[in-house]
Amino acid sequence: MIKKFDKKDEESGIGSNPFQHLEKSAVLQEARLFNETPINPRRCLHILTKILYLLNQGEHFGTMEATEAFFAMTRLFQSNDQTLRRMCYLTIKEMANISEDVIIVTSSLTKDMTGKEDVYRGPAIRALCRITDATMLQGIERYMKQAIVDKIPSVSSSALVSSLNMTKISYDVVKRWINEAQEAASSDNIMVQYHALGLLYNLKKNDRLAVSKMLNKYTKSGVKSPFAYCMLIRIASRLLEESEEGHNSPLFDFIESCLRNKHEMVIYEAASAIIHLPNCTARELAPAVSVLQLFCSSPKPALRYAAVRTLNKVAMKHPSAVTACNLDLENLITDSNRSIATLAITTLLKTGSESSVDRLMKQISTFVSEISDEFKVVVVQAISALCQKYPRKHSVMMTFLSNMLRDDGGFEYKRAIVDCIISIIEENPDSKESGLAHMCEFIEDCEHTVLATKILHLLGKEGPKTPTPSKYIRFIFNRVVLENEAVRAAAVSALAKFGAQNESLLPSVLVLLQRCMMDSDDEVRDRATFYFNVLKQQQLALNAAYIFNGLTVSVFGMEKALHQYTLEPSEKPFDMKTVPLATVPFMDQKTDLAPMATKQPEKAVPVRQDIFQEQLAVIPEFKNLGPLFKSSEPVQLTEAETEYFVRCIKHVFPNHFVFQFDCTNTLNDQLLEKVTVQMEPSEAYEVLHYVPAPSLTYNQPGICYTLVSLPDDDPTAVSCTFSCTMKFVVRDCDPQTGVPDDEGYSDEYVLEDLELSLSDHIQKVLKPNFGASWEEVGDAYEKEETFALTTTKTLEEAVNNIIKFLGMQPCERSDKVPENKNSHVLYLSGVFRGGHDALVRSRLALADGVTMQVTVRSQDETPADVILASVG
């Protein structure tokens, strides 16, 4: 029985780690005891334990000192003490990679491996395989084959697991032991059968047909080991995911049959596999959910936990499938295990009806203070999902969340609550004032700088739009007086937004900013001075450019461009259009599966587009194309099961497109060389250059590029269809060795057509204050037209189609159409290729289809013409 130590014991050192203050040099000095005769097993055991402890704590051993200790340890093989011998095996495995000449123990290990002492044989095999390299493997091959089929289960299991590890060193040699592995797979011992099956799968996993045959054999004949059943289920589910047969396959029938197995672990594995299969319908989930429902009433806490955790996952995608379990889940709310109770309540929050929300919230409040922060975050995530499902219940949720915010808790927990309240404010305009009031109360006593700055940003964004914005000024200015530099700077920015949007508050804000100009911190002073001078001009366009919208460029890209500018001094001022735009974060794509409280990077890191910019810049043909404007999502140009897998990423530059083709050769008997994708445009686009992929070996992806110039004479030609053909030189090769023939021959493969559309020329850019941005751009290049969308039946459908077609960013949450409305205004913003801001205001009216009045404003005439021409 483990003794439980209280805090006093810890402080006095009683019961603390006996190896806590070990010094490597002292332990290595003690290791010299190994050379003494007679050998003292007890003392040697203690020293070996110390060495293993240091190694596992990450202590660095130099090669010389490790080798010296290793050689001294080899003398311990002269002792017949069983415990000492097995400790030697463990130490050999740990020191194999840091000592030199470890092969000197090969003969001792081989002797133990083939000896009569069964207790030595298994550990000796594991240690021997750890020090064996590819050149020595054939020397012990005969012993390994014998050990795999040995009657002693521990020996057979050791040989099988070691063989599995040896496949990384010499796959071809281990593959010759497949007959022995198949013999071991028919063993009566559950662990031997499991390990044998694992080795067989590892040897055959690259051959889909062989895996299917193996699965077919063992699913029909059956296995005795529950562990082996679990492995078969996992292999079957992996094959099901890769195949198109889906739930009509015999593999699915096998997994479903395992729900009736006598072993609980097999039943759970089968249920879990069914639930995680893609595109599973509620009807197909039903048997798995029924089994999990039975587990909910199990006397075993582990089974109850597994069941409710899995049902929680099901509820994220198929809440209706879990509704039948609601009664069982309600019984688990009072479970003595708080983890089970938390998962039960969060599952009920996902599946419950609107009428049950109040009751569930009361039940949560009774025990929420007793659970860990990790589970509190899970509860908050469930509440967030419930808010989206039942927006009218926001007041109940908001009250509950504000109470949780007052409780003690760590940063991740508090951030989850703040994120949840922000999402409620954004989704429910009616909740804005109460939500902002809770946020103001929280920052009065907030110890987390990140959260304080986030809330101040929210107040600056939403506060000025409320009926009485003046009430937030006091809370914001308190932060300037009481907080650290980062929070003070954020408070100054928030104050400026109030002054920019509310004329009545402007004089007061200017006075407060003047006070901030005396701050001790440079950043706070600079911000206050800058905003003070901008606000004094009282120009809406200036406010929009420098207070509301801010910079829309990539921080990493700007840092790099500025650094380059300082390295090459020029009389020309720095041009912001040379900096790549920042891509819009996919906030609306959050799912319940992704935790809300994920760690954010503390410094600017390169995003996907910045990485592409660096990769393309090193290719000589692309050096003078200018800044990378946009990179598209990958477009698949082949079917999933074809000989070659090709997908395309479209990189947009001011006057060119670079098409990046990611190609994978799925044929193991071919080596492809000089791979290019030839493109034939339907319009006036011109192909300038091909950059080939030098070679494509089996299953190793390669990249080739095609450079295309845009038509000079027609800037409105934004749409084009390219016919694509992959051309290459084929060299046949041996599938086993991968060695290609000397001679090759030319071949080609026709790909799907590739489309260019308007959305490829526009980068999404979020404008926090659309009205101010609209005035900032001005009406110099304003175009307007009215269209009839006869095939569109709802405003929601019209909004989604417009956003998708134009590829622009919705602003002011105008992508959400209020219920029971016959008219709506959609605001979109973006930047057209070349760096020109483009704004679209689309007035929609529903009557026998949808009538749409589109107004476009831009800094240049071309984007306005292009957008209207494309919509028409």
From Swiss-Prot:
Biological processes per GO annotation: endoplasmic reticulum to Golgi vesicle-mediated transport; intra-Golgi vesicle-mediated transport; intracellular protein transport; organelle transport along microtubule; protein secretion
Bilayer topology annotation: Peripheral membrane protein
Keyword annotations from UniProtKB, A to Z: Cytoplasm, Cytoplasmic vesicle, ER-Golgi transport, Golgi apparatus, Membrane, Protein transport, Repeat, Transport
InterPro entries xref list: ARM-like, ARM-type_fold, Clathrin/coatomer_adapt-like_N, Clathrin_app_Ig-like_sf, Coatomer/calthrin_app_sub_C, Coatomer_g_Cpla, Coatomer_gsu, Coatomer_gsu_app_Ig-like_dom
Main location: cytoplasm
HEAT repeat start-end pairs: 64-101, 283-320, 321-355, 356-392, 395-430, 467-504
GO cellular component: COPI vesicle coat; endoplasmic reticulum; endoplasmic reticulum-Golgi intermediate compartment; Golgi membrane
One GO MF term attached to the UniProt entry: structural molecule activity
Pfam families according to UniProt: Adaptin_N (PF01602), Coatomer_g_Cpla (PF16381), COP-gamma_platf (PF08752)
Subcellular location(s) of the protein: Cytoplasm; Golgi apparatus membrane; Cytoplasmic vesicle, COPI-coated vesicle membrane
Quaternary data: Oligomeric complex.
Family that this chain belongs to: Belongs to the COPG family.
Function, in words: The coatomer is a cytosolic protein complex that binds to dilysine motifs and reversibly associates with Golgi non-clathrin-coated vesicles, which further mediate biosynthetic protein transport from the ER, via the Golgi up to the trans Golgi network. Coatomer complex is required for budding from Golgi membranes, and is essential for the retrograde Golgi-to-ER transport of dilysine-tagged proteins.
Protein name as annotated: Coatomer subunit gamma-2
Native source organism of the sequence: Xenopus laevis
Gene name of this polypeptide: copg2
